[in-house]
Amino acid sequence: MKLILTAEVEHLGVAGDTVEVKDGYGRNYLLPRGLAIVATRGAQRQADDIRRAQELKGVKGLEHARELKTAIEALESVELSVKTAGDSGKLFGSVTAADVVSAIKKAGGPNLEKRTVDLPKAHIKSTGTHPITVRLHPDVNAALSLNVVAG
C-alpha cells in the first residue's frame, strides 16, 4: 500500500514522504491515527506544496533566529532579583525558565517562549551567576549569563 506520511513516524519517514507499507500496517495503524493518507496524484501534489512551504519557512526561521541570537547576546548578562533568598545564598524556591524569560524581556531582550530556555539544571536554587542557553532554532543557540541576586 502506498501512503504519504502526514507526521513523522519512527523508522519510516517524516511528513511528506511517500512510503510503501504492508496493507495491515497502513489500514490498522497509520490511517486511523492520521499519520498518513492514501497516495493519489492530488495528495502527492498537496504533499509537494507542503514540503516547499516548510522549506521556505525553515529559511525564514533561521534568519529570524540569527537576529534573535544577536539581540540576546548583546545583553551579555541579565540580572534577576529574587525576594526569597537565605543568608547563605540558597533560594527558598527556585528560578524557572519562565522567570528567566521575564528577566530577559525586562532587560530589553526579545519576547521568548519558556520552552526555548535551557537551564544548567532543572531549576536554579542559589544566588550567583549561572550560564543560560536559549534554543532559537535547531542550528542556532544563544548563550548568556543570568545573575541571580537576593532582593
Curated annotation (Swiss-Prot):
A Pfam family hit: Ribosomal_L9_N
SS bond partners: none
GO biological process: translation
GO cellular component: a single term: ribosome
SUPFAM superfamilies documented for this protein: L9 N-domain-like, Ribosomal protein L9 C-domain
The entry's keywords: Ribonucleoprotein, Ribosomal protein, RNA-binding, rRNA-binding
Chain's role: Binds to the 23S rRNA.
Record's protein name: Large ribosomal subunit protein bL9
Record organism: Mycolicibacterium gilvum (strain PYR-GCK) (Mycobacterium gilvum (strain PYR-GCK))
Gene, per the UniProt record: rplI
